[in-house]
Curated annotation (Swiss-Prot):
Positions of disulphide bridges: 26-37, 54-154, 129-146
Domain C-type lectin: 33-155
Keyword Calcium: yes
GO MF entries: carbohydrate binding; metal ion binding; toxin activity
Tissue: Expressed by the venom gland.
Signal peptide feature range: 1-23
Name of this protein: C-type lection lectoxin-Enh3
Family to which this protein belongs: Belongs to the true venom lectin family.
InterPro entries (UniProt xref): C-type_lectin-like, C-type_lectin-like/link_sf, C-type_lectin/snaclec_domain, C-type_lectin_CS, CTDL_fold
Native source organism of the sequence: Pseudoferania polylepis (Macleay's water snake)
Amino acid sequence: MGQFTVVSLGLLAMFLSLSGAKGDNCPASWISRNGVCNKLFPDRKTWLEAEMYCRALKPGCHLASLHRDSDSTVLAWYISDHFKGAGHVWIGLRDTNRKRTWKWSDRTSTNYFSWNQGEPNNVQDNENCVHLWAPSGYLKWNDEPCASLHPFICQYKL
């Protein structure tokens, strides 16, 4: 009877772990945060090339959008810990109509900003895209010409 109980408990544990695997986990090379999956791509691309690359990965995938300090902290840790020397990293924020109206590429609400001191400064009236600023440990943002080449973070909702 004792052996039957151990086997039954083992089967129950296996069933529960399999029933929890509903495809709501991020792939192995992606990180999970607040219901989304993120992955840093070290290839250097313009902002638009990076956004198009993310969109081609899967439906609903875009450059990352950040909506709270905890989002910034998780991504900063991920980049700093796994991709030392990546440089600045594109996120999905952009001023599409050049009126200093910032919008996320995934069309989520723009309710949070983490600008570096003195930013956005729109140097030479040509800084309409946003990256995570490397010297801040990837916690602060800087506006940059969209044609600059940087690694980037893609994101999709679970």
